[in-house]
Design a protein with these regions (language model features):
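Intrinsically disordered, low-complexity coil segments
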Residues: 11, 38-41, 89-93
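Conserved small-domain helix->loop->beta segment predominantly found in fold-type I
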Residues: 9-18, 41-52, 66-69
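Structural signature of PLP-dependent enzymes
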Residues: 17, 21-28
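Conserved C-terminal structural/oligomerization subdomain of aldehyde/semialdehyde dehydrogenase
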Residues: 1-6, 50-53, 57-192
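Long, low-complexity segments enriched in small/aliphatic residues
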Residues: 27-43
Length: 192
């Protein structure tokens, strides 16, 4: 129940939600929420309020759409706004393909299931859909300093900050092979 999510200053550790990072982020999120309020292709089923009189607070908002390519399904919002699209069970594989192709972004993603087959299928088919992929966990669950983190596609270079792989972004690795006894014949020894 979103009504139980306490929102306020990050100095108060009893708050679960705090303000978004800056006014630009607030304005972007508020504009998406306002758009949904007047759009026949989507509806707000929870939340939808915002206030910047003291801080940039966006109420956790859930949007329901019948259009799997609705703008809030394809855009990185970076705020407490999530859009839901309900698919038919018979379209599971088509829906996975749709998820993989819908957005140019690929920072994080998550699937929730108790069906081991569905988990494996989704994990395999969504291989390039998220730099960090979560199974039965929230997609914002990176453990800073303990878990490599980074997105692909338009979300970044998938460098995995916090891991040795990140070093590859800043260097130009190459392999050098030197032979101290140059070949005198093109044939491998086993060919003679």
């Amino acid at each position: 129940d979103l009504a139980t999510f306490k929102m306020g200053s990050p100095e108060d550790m009893s708050n679960f939600i705090t303000a978004v990072i800056h006014e630009g982020s607030f304005d972007k999120l508020a504009s998406y929420i306002d758009r949904v309020k007047t759009d026949a292709n989507a509806e707000i089923i929870a939340g939808g309020n915002y206030d910047k009189s003291e801080g940039y607070f966006i109420e956790p908002t859930i949007i329901l759409t019948k259009d799997p390519k609705y703008t809030t399904m394809c855009t990185e919002l970076f705020g407490p706004v999530v859009t839901i699209y309900v698919y038919e069970d018979a379209t599971w594989l088509d829906t996975l393909a749709l998820v993989d192709a819908t957005s140019e972004y690929a920072l994080t993603g998550a699937i929730f299931s108790t069906d081991r087959y569905a988990i494996t299928e989704a994990t395999n088919l969504l291989e390039n859909c998220a730099g960090n992929f979560y199974i039965n966990d929230k997609p914002s669950g990176a453990v800073v300093g303990q878990q490599p983190f980074g997105g692909a596609r338009a979300s970044g270079t998938n460098d995995k900050a916090g891991s040795p792989q990140n070093l590859l972004r800043w260097v130009s690795p190459r392999l050098i092979k030197e032979t101290f006894t140059p070949a005198t014949d093109y044939r491998y020894p086993f060919l003679s």
